[in-house]
Regions:
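Bacterial N-terminal signal peptides
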Residues: 1-9
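Cleavable N-terminal signal peptides
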Residues: 2, 13, 17-18
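Generic recognition of cysteine residues
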Residues: 4, 139, 248-249
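Short, basic/low-complexity N-terminal boundary segments at the transition from targeting/disordered tails
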Residues: 12, 30, 331-334
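Active-site-adjacent loops and short helices of periplasmic peptidoglycan-processing enzymes
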Residues: 16-202
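Domain-terminus/edge residues, biased toward the C-terminal soluble/receptor-binding domains
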Residues: 166, 170, 182-395
Length: 395
């Protein structure tokens, strides 16, 4: 299979988000080597670890202690919320489903809505309690309903973490309570990864952006533990957490125009420190970065010849291209490289890779998207080959 390469500057709609004051994308990860140097952040953040990530492509824009294993407290709940969203996508769960509260869920300490054993609530109500108020009993009830038991749910949390490449993470529970364990750990990088995945589900914003709500006919008041929801322009969530071991933690996400950022702060000594740190990171990100949505000209992606196929050519499907995050002023430096097969051998499967589009600056890849076959193409039989040959000779 031969390849043709096309390298050219991009054109696109540039979204200048202004100063703050809110596909196969290639993630730029912090490495173990980064940990040895403990990089300085561009803004003051009083925390054990902090990180700013572009939610579109997964680029790390700033970090310190990104892979240091720390207690996350209730920031843990991002993963249970993700599993609930994915269960909705699979049709395994509905917002109107009713959940009967178990004795174990009712006994959960810490932040709670005082669920009683045998009490019933809808999935929607439990989601509101878990996402807005960080209720441990509601989160546990959701997990038990989804997986059958808390143990099975924790196993599912850890499986999903491994699938996402969260190699610094070990969940002991779905709440973040750490008073009886020293093994419930994650990192700022892993928190950003699961936050980014959760933000792919727009439904979650119906919960994480709510400042105040109520349950039980107004008898139970819910106030969001993330005070940035009330004060920060463009905020989309996401989750706070506080324990004696973890300190004060937050994963804060915000979006302005096409630029969505995730600021993770772990191990701050006070609540104000975590919010000030997250806000400072977001402000710096919006002031210094912007989103460019490249335009891929269909004329640059010609049909690919299919050798011995029932069709002579196949037209690759153009990918849906997400915004690429760049330093402001670098939009003219973005290059688009198209790698496309000249021909492929039949049979061709639907979705088969025929090439890819790579966006880069100075040789550093920022995002990569596949060019795929829209449908299957079968292999010609001997009779079909003979008829095609006769047809060609007769012209």
């Amino acid at each position: 299979m031969a390849l043709c390469l096309i390298l050219l500057p991009t054109s696109g709609a540039f979204a200048d988000v202004g100063a703050a004051d809110e596909a196969l994308p290639a993630a730029v990860k912090a490495t173990a080597a980064d940990e040895k140097t403990k990089p300085a952040l561009p803004v003051p953040v009083n925390a054990k670890a902090a990180l700013l990530m572009d939610a579109s492509g997964g680029q790390i824009l700033a970090q310190t202690g990104a892979h240091e294993k720390l207690f996350p407290a209730s920031v843990t709940k991002i993963m249970p919320l993700l599993l609930v969203m994915e269960a909705f996508d699979r049709g395994e769960l509905q917002l109107t489903d009713t959940v009967k509260v178990s004795a174990d869920a009712a006994k959960k300490g810490g932040s709670q809505i005082w669920l009683k054993e045998g009490e019933t609530m809808t999935v929607d109500e439990l989601l509101r309690a878990a996402a807005i108020y960080s209720a441990n009993d509601a989160c546990t009830a959701l997990g038990e309903h989804l997986a059958g038991s808390e143990e099975a749910f924790v196993a599912a949390l850890n499986r999903r973490a491994k699938e996402l490449g969260m190699n610094d993470t070990n969940f002991v529970n779905g709440t973040g309570l750490d008073d009886t364990t020293d093994e419930h750990l994650t990192s700022a990088y892993d928190v950003a990864v699961m936050s980014r995945e959760l933000l792919k589900h727009p439904l979650i914003l119906n919960y994480t952006t709510v400042w105040m709500d109520s349950l039980r006919g107004g008898a139970t008041q819910l106030v969001n533990t993330n005070k940035l929801v009330r004060t920060y322009p463009g905020i989309t969530g996401l989750k706070t957490g506080t324990t004696n071991k973890a300190g004060c933690c937050v994963s804060a996400s915000a979006k302005r125009d096409d630029l969505q950022l995730i600021a993770v702060v772990l191990g701050s000594p006070t609540s104000n420190d975590r919010f000030d740190g997250a806000k400072a990171l977001l402000n710096w990100g919006f002031a210094n970065y912007a989103a460019l949505t490249p335009k891929l000209d269909p004329a640059l992606v010609p049909p690919v010849a299919v050798l011995r196929g029932t069709e002579e050519t196949i037209q690759p499907v153009l990918p849906q291209i997400a915004p690429v995050v760049l330093k402001k002023g670098e939009e003219g430096k973005l290059q688009q490289e198209i790698q496309l097969a000249v021909d492929v051998q039949a049979p061709v499967e639907e979705g088969q890779a025929l090439g890819k589009v790579i966006y880069s600056i100075g040789g550093k890849a920022l995002a990569e998207y596949p060019l795929t076959a829209p449908e299957s193409v079968g292999k010609m039989t001997f009779g079909e080959m003979f008829r095609r040959l006769l047809g060609a000779l007769g012209k």
